[in-house]
Amino acid sequence: MMPRMGPPSSSKQEPTMFMSFRNPQWPANFINRDNVLDYFCNQGNVFYEMNSCNQQIKMQNITNRSVDECLRNMQGIQYVLWYSQPPLYIVCKQRRNNATNVSPIAYYYVINGSVHQAPDMHTLVQSRLLGALEPLRNAFGEVTNYSRYNTAKGYYWEFKNKPSMKKKEEEKKEEDERKLEERSTNFQKARTMMLLNQLFTEMPADEALEKLDVKEEENPKPEEAPSASAVGEPKFAEPAARATTK
């Protein structure tokens, strides 16, 4: 008879769901598919049960057969490598009833030397539903504040307290200016103003304009020679008109 499968108990699932295990004595790049089970089956691992079949094999020091072959001939809690794609390894915790019948209990993934418990379907769906329902609950609570009822009009909306977009932009602008002011201290402001006043005193704007005018007068632009088109062709004097006699 197969054991009844259902959502795991929250009292057993919640503590280990947010836990992790890491053995500092094992470098992360040293872990591969051949020794990942040895890394997982550690007494300090919170996900590892000491009464499992893997622990019995380690205590008996069986070396003439592979671990998978030994586990197929044993019954009880077992840990097997389910998937391998370095640096990711997935370990399955299962209950073996006979040589051909196993019931998965939980999955764990090992990545870069850290062991974490994979969420089951019940926990995953519950988390997604809570993540979707919480914004809806906040939205309905916000909408309820603007709902009004009148015997003549019935239900209607009233958004008098809703701030306008222009006001929001002004508040945002003031906040940005306030942040810019907070970046400098009073000493820095006073020091900057003193340096600017000193520069204006040493190099006033009027003297700079006068010097610029003097330079332009000292270096007058050379007169351009008139072009041939402006001079035109030479004109000859016309002969005096002959006197007419009657």
Swiss-Prot record:
Which GO terms fall under molecular function for this chain's record?
transcription coactivator activity
Q: Which Pfam families match?
A: Med6 (PF04934)
Where does the record place a coiled coil? none
Superkingdom of this entry's organism?
A: Eukaryota
A GO cellular component annotation in the UniProt record: mediator complex
Q: Does the keyword Transcription apply?
A: yes
UniProt keywords, alphabetically: Activator, Nucleus, Transcription, Transcription regulation
Q: Where can this protein be found?
A: Nucleus
Q: What is its main location?
A: nucleus
Q: What does this protein do?
A: Component of the Mediator complex, a coactivator involved in the regulated transcription of nearly all RNA polymerase II-dependent genes. Mediator functions as a bridge to convey information from gene-specific regulatory proteins to the basal RNA polymerase II transcription machinery. Mediator is recruited to promoters by direct interactions with regulatory proteins and serves as a scaffold for the assembly of a functional preinitiation complex with RNA polymerase II and the general transcription factors.
| Protein name per UniProt | Mediator of RNA polymerase II transcription subunit 6
Q: Which organism is it from?
A: Caenorhabditis briggsae
The lineage is:
Eukaryota, Metazoa, Ecdysozoa, Nematoda, Chromadorea
